[in-house]
């Protein structure tokens, strides 16, 4: 990863109060958001994607009956150089934590990144995702992003 920061002074948003529930039988926006809210930003590992407003509860769509989850994330800058890493991390975290029946779709929010189409194409290509996950350095970074302090 580059040692040069693209976003030296990111805006930090207040976290929403963490909510818990006792019924864990269904997968919905609430449970899916809780699965990914603590993913760390690759450029600022002391901050979560939620802290930077890259992920919000509103960016999570779930259809339990159709076994479908869509996450739309917003990079902090239109020229952010790590949106693919962020998207891959979200994808991996959800695939690892959701029941196997779910199809997971991760996308950059429309108009939020200069290379939105390219990033979305990469994240939607199973062969590219599989190839990326064979890179030990990238896997190490993704694991670091998913670590909960």
UniProtKB/Swiss-Prot annotation:
Is Transmembrane there in the keyword field? no
Q: Membrane spanning segments where?
A: none
**Which GO biological process entries does UniProt record here?**
chromosome segregation; protein maturation
Instruction: Return the InterPro entries for the record.
Output: FSCA_dom_sf, MIP18, MIP18-like
On whether DNA-binding is a keyword of this UniProt record, the answer is: no
Q: Name the domain of life.
A: Eukaryota
Keywords, in A-Z order:
Chromosome partition
Sequence similarity: Belongs to the MIP18 family.
Function, as annotated: May play a role in chromosome segregation through establishment of sister chromatid cohesion. Unable to complement ae7 mutants, and thus probably not involved in the cytosolic iron-sulfur assembly (CIA) pathway.
**What is the recorded name of this protein?**
Protein AE7-like 2
Task: Give the species.
Answer: Arabidopsis thaliana
- Write the lineage as a comma-separated list: Eukaryota, Viridiplantae, Streptophyta, Embryophyta, Tracheophyta
């Amino acid at each position: 990863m580059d040692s040069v920061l693209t976003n030296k002074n990111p805006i930090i948003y207040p976290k929403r109060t963490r909510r818990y529930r006792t019924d864990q039988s269904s997968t919905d926006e609430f449970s899916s958001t809780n699965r990914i809210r603590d993913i760390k930003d690759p450029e600022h590992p002391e901050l979560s994607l939620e802290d930077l407003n890259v992920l919000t509860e509103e960016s999570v769509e779930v259809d339990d009956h159709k076994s479908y989850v869509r996450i739309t994330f917003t990079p902090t800058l239109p020229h952010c150089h790590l949106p693919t890493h962020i998207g891959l991390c979200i994808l991996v975290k959800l695939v690892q934590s959701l029941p196997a029946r779910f199809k997971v779709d991760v996308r950059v929010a429309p108009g939020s990144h200069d290379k939105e189409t390219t990033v979305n194409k990469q994240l939607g290509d199973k062969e590219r995702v599989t190839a990326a996950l064979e890179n030990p350095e990238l896997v190490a970074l993704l694991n670091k992003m998913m670590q909960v302090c």
